[in-house]
Amino acid sequence: MVRDRPFQVVSTMPDIKRKWSFTWLPPAIRILFKGMPGVWRHRHQLVFCWLIVMQIVTSGARTLSGLSQSAPGFITEWRFRRLLSAGYWSLKVLLHWFAEEAIKSLPVPENQVLYVIADGSKKDKRGPKNPAAQKGRLNEHHAWFFGIKFVVLMVAWDDYRIPVDFQMVLPKGHPDYKKENELFRHMLSHFQPPDWAKVVMVVGDAAFAAKDNMKLIQARDKADSQRCWGFVFAIARTWNMADGKSLRNLVKHTPHSCYRKTWIPRLPDHKGRKTFWIFEKLTLLKHLGDVTVVLTKKGRNVGPQNTKLLVTNLLELTGRQVIDIYQRRWAIEILFKELKSGLGLGEHQVTKKLPRIEKSLGIALIAYLFLLRARKDDIKPGKPWSIFQLKTNFTMDLIQKQFQHSMALEINKWKKAA
C-alpha cells in the first residue's frame, strides 16, 4: 500500500523573506565624499563610505552587526570592525573636513554672527571592559550612571546647528585624564571660524564659566584682527567683584523695583515669546576686568534662589540681547538628542582601546554632517527642522534610486538574453 503524500504547493513568487540590501551608491552621494583627505589604505575608503550611509539609513540597532544587514554582501561586520580598529587613520582630520564642507554648503547669515556652543553629555554603557566607561552623575540631583562622558563643540547661526569637534572625558584614574574645561580650551584654541564670521559668540552654561576659558576668549579677541570674540556664560554666585563683594550679595540684596520686564522671541520650533525680569549691571570682576552681569528670572516676585546670572565681556550688549544669545545654548541639547536617538551615537560594540571608541563616537558626528550636506535643501529658512526628517527623506530617496538601478540591470539582462 502506497502512503499518500501531503499535497505541496510550489510557489512561483520570489521569496519576500529574503534579506534585501543596497548594492550601490548613487552618484549624488558619491560626489559628497569627493575631496576627502587621502588617509586610506586598501579598500577602507569604500568601507568608510558605506559605514556612514548605513549609520544614517539603519533604523534598528546600530551595532556593527546591525549596520551590515542592509549593506552589500562584501560589506560585513568584520570589515567595519577592522576599519575602526585600524590605527593609521585619524578621525579628527575627517571630522574637521566634513565640518568645513558642511559650513561652506549652508547660506551665510545676514548679521555675520557665529555662535560657538559647548556642552557635555554621556552615553550609557554596560560593558565593564570599556576603558572610557566610568561611574558618575551630572550633579547631586541626578541619578548615577555608568557610561562614556564627552564634550561637544558646535557652531550655530540662524536655524543651523553643526558639530565641529568633540573630546572624550576619561575616568579620573586614567593617566591621560583631563577636565572638561581643559578639553574645551583645547577644542576652542584649534577652532578656526569661517571667513564670513565677523563676530564669534561663545556660549556655555556655568560648568564652562571658568576664568581660564574666558581669558582664552579674550586672548583670541586681541589676537584676531578680522573679527570680534565675545562670550555669554551662566556664572556661579561664588565669583567676587573687584571691591571684594560676591555676586551672591548682589542677587540677594537687589530689590524687585530694580528689575525691568522684557521679552525675547522663542526658538524657531516654538511659537510665541518668553518673558523675563532682568537687572543688568556694569561691574569689574576679578581676573576678567569690565563685564556686564545680568540677573534674570521668570517672574517679578521670584526669589533669589531661582535667579540666573549671566556674564558677557561685550559691554555694548543690552540685557535683552544677552538672554537672547544665551537661549541659543538649547541648540546643543537638541543636537545630543538627534545624535543619540537619530544616528545611534555610541552604539557600536567596540571596546579595549581608546582610539577605537573615539572613532565609534565620531562616526555618528560625521554621519550628521554628511546628512546636512545631502539634504540641505530640505531645511527651509526660518522654519524648524529635524535630523529625523532629513534621515527619512535621505533613506526614501536612496531606496528609490536603488530600485531604479536594480530594474535597469534586470532590463539590460533581459535584452541581452533576447
Regions found by a protein language model. Give the residues of each.
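Gly/serine-rich nucleotide phosphate-binding loop at the start of the catalytic core
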Residues: 2-91
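Active-site-proximal, Lys/Arg-enriched surface segment
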Residues: 53-54, 83-160, 170, 276
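Short, conserved catalytic/metal-binding motifs centered on acidic residues
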Residues: 67-68, 112-126, 153, 200-209, ...
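Electropositive, glycine- and tryptophan-enriched low-complexity nucleic-acid-binding patches
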Residues: 78-82, 87, 138-199, 291-308
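A short acidic-Thr-Gly-centered motif at the start of a beta-strand
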Residues: 95-114, 188-196, 212-215, 315
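Short amphipathic alpha-helical "interface-anchor" segments enriched in bulky aromatics
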Residues: 122, 319-350
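An internal, acidic/charged active-site-proximal segment
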Residues: 168-298, 383-387, 394
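Basic, amphipathic alpha-helical segments enriched in Lys/Arg and hydrophobic/aromatic residues
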Residues: 345-401
